[in-house]
From Swiss-Prot:
Gene name for this UniProt entry: CAD1
Changes seen on gene knockout: Constitutively activated HR-like cell death phenotype with endogenous accumulation of high levels of salicylic acid (SA) and constitutively activated defense phenotype against challenge with P.syringae. Dwarf plant with normal cotyledons, but dark brown- or black-colored cell death lesions on the true leaves.
UniProt xrefs under Pfam families: MACPF (PF01823)
Stated family: Belongs to the complement C6/C7/C8/C9 (TC 1.C.39) family.
Tissue expression remark: Mainly expressed in the vascular system.
PROSITE patterns: MACPF_2 (PS51412)
Keyword Transmembrane (UniProt): no
Ranges where the record places region Disordered: 489-514
Name the record gives this protein: MACPF domain-containing protein CAD1
Length: 561
């Protein structure tokens, strides 16, 4: 980072400055959720309701400048002046820029904070954002009028905060703790103004690093260092080259077009331009349940589900497995129906095994080529290995739910039949399979997928592959929202820790089996923690044909519990 220092601004005693300073001091020691932007309104609790102990009995008046006094400031709080100047972060990667923001905030690692996302207009999961970003840069002028901070080197939490930590993995209590107290504690607040240009290069942009750096240099020269700031035509020029340029100011009078005139208004209208933090968990040594809270906060910061969904998000962070297990796959080649795609081409045998998982929520599906010749098509289900707590009152083993029901397409309904290669050979029934009696808001309960089976209708050379699903009722729940997902994991860049990768399910094969691998899309269709709000269940699926391949598409739903 480059930092060109300027002189101190003359700071008059203004009502706005006094109010902002007082609010900044009251924010020190309060809880904060760092998935939010750095604004005082995101502090937890009422003003002055600190999570850490502050010596309140030895307050004093602070003389800040030219007789400007700030009365009744606790002895454990320091206040200092800052130096104005230009700062830049040269062209770097998504993760490098995220780490720069974290360093400014006193937070370790490179998982993006809320202030980073807010400045660069990121709203999705960081995995998707990082995959879509080629490079980032920023340049700006910072006017830090005052920096207030906790002077104590050793912070101590109030006892009621320590007692509020759940002693076990209880998603509801953990979510409540984070909502009430945040993830970190505010240790310093900087007030003043900043005028920053954020540059975001998308993956599709052909521009070299040198051209973006030249633009940054021009911005420094013309926007920040000339008496009358000149307009920069760069954003218009770069718009067609997949470069997003974002201008943001904080503090001062934003109606002033000129940077120089805007800077003069900052002392009379300062705002919060930076905050630093310390993790709450760093002050909880020896507290029962610390590891559970640490894990909950780490998951929350990494995936950033909406706070109102955090309980359900945490509840679904259970190990996942694929059914059938690899050890249970048949070693002996079974007798199967088959599909033929051309007169002389290889046959694709279809496993008609029913794959069921009982009362374990299904989160994904995939097609797989199996057997010694990789010529037998089967279907696999990804499921949670245990039942989330939120579902236990509705779906535990003692709860009567009735017999699960298989549902599939009509054999004679040829409207859904699509040829895989040629019309005179095998087809696929593309009929959507979903429980038609379940509607959004239905109070009688919902039906979710707990099993799947492939089958073949024998129409001579025009055999038809079809899908059946097993539906089980979940009483007392309703469907909140449903979506059909047509994006396989592999092509969307999503990551699923611990799950088999798409490459492992599409083995390199040769000869006839290699031809079959080109006909079957074995990409994993699933939703995990990176698919916000992170507690999706499978409620339907359908087979399809795309570009000569048999594909699987899945319907996911969120439940109201």
């Amino acid at each position: 980072m480059e930092n060109r220092k300027g002189g101190n601004f003359s700071v008059p005693s203004s009502e706005a400055l006094t109010t902002t300073l007082r609010n900044a001091i009251q924010a020190l020691g309060r809880g904060f959720d760092v998935t939010s932007d750095v604004r005082l309104l995101y502090c937890k609790g009422a003003p002055g309701s600190r999570l850490v102990r502050i010596e309140e009995g030895q307050n004093r008046d602070l003389e800040l400048s030219h007789g400007f006094l700030l009365p009744n400031v606790p002895a454990d709080i320091d206040c200092s002046r800052g130096n104005s100047g230009t700062q830049r972060i040269s062209v770097c990667s998504f993760h490098e820029m995220a780490e720069e923001f974290n360093v400014r905030s006193g937070v370790k690692g490179n998982i993006p904070l809320g202030c980073f996302n807010a400045m660069f207009n990121y709203t999705g999961s960081w995995q998707v954002d990082a995959a879509s970003t080629k490079s980032l840069a920023l340049v700006g002028y910072f006017i830090p009028l005052y920096d207030v901070k906790l002077a104590k080197l050793t912070l101590v939490l109030h006892n009621e905060i320590r007692r509020a930590v759940p002693s076990s993995w209880d998603p509801a209590s953990l979510a409540s703790f984070i909502e009430n107290y945040g993830t970190h504690i505010v240790t310093s607040v900087t007030i003043g103004g900043r005028d920053v240009v954020y540059i975001r290069q998308h993956q599709s942009s052909p521009l070299p690093v040198s051209e973006i750096e030249n633009y940054v240099n021009d911005m420094i020269k013309h926007r920040f260092h000339e008496a009358e700031s000149q307009s920069i035509t760069g954003p218009l020029k770069y718009k067609d080259k997949d470069i997003t340029v974002i201008f943001r100011r904080r503090g001062g009078d934003d109606l002033e077009q000129s940077h120089a005139r805007w800077a003069e208004t900052v002392p009379a209208a300062p705002d919060i331009i930076n905050m630093t933090f310390t993790p709450i968990v760093s002050l909880l040594e020896g507290v029962p349940g610390l590891r559970h809270l640490t894990r909950a906060i780490e998951l929350y910061l990494e995936y950033k589900p909406p706070i109102e969904d955090l309980q359900y998000f945490l509840d679904y962070q259970i190990a996942r497995a694929w059914a059938p297990e690899q050890s249970n796959l048949q070693r002996k080649e079974p007798v199967c129906s088959s599909l033929q795609f051309s007169l002389m081409g290889p046959k694709l045998f279809i496993s008609a095994d029913q794959v069921t998982v009982g009362r374990k929520p299904v989160t994904g599906l995939r097609l797989s080529l199996e057997g010694s010749k990789q010529n037998r098509l089967s279907i696999h289900l990804q499921h949670l290995v245990s039942l989330p707590k939120i579902l236990q009152p509705h779906w535990d083993s003692h709860v009567p739910i009735g017999a699960p029901k298989w549902q599939g397409p009509e054999e004679q309904d040829s409207r859904w039949f699509e040829p895989i290669k040629w019309k005179n050979f095998s087809h696929v029934s593309t009929s959507p399979i979903e429980h038609t009696e379940t509607h959004i808001g239905d109070l009688s309960g919902v039906h979710i997928v707990t099993g799947a089976q492939l089958g073949v209708w024998d129409f001579g050379s025009k055999n038809v592959l079809h899908l059946k699903l097993l539906f089980s009722k979940v009483p007392g729940c309703t469907i909140r929202r449903s979506v059909w997902d047509h994006t396989p994991v592999a092509s969307s860049g999503r990551l699923e820790p611990g799950g088999p990768s798409t490459s492992s399910s599409t083995e390199e094969v040769s000869g006839q089996s290699g031809k079959l691998a080109k006909i079957v899309d074995s990409s994993e269709m699933l939703k995990g923690p990176q698919d916000l709000p992170g507690h999706w269940l499978v409620t339907g699926a359908k087979l399809g044909v795309e570009k000569g391949k048999i594909v699987l598409r899945v319907k996911y739903s969120l439940l109201n519990y």
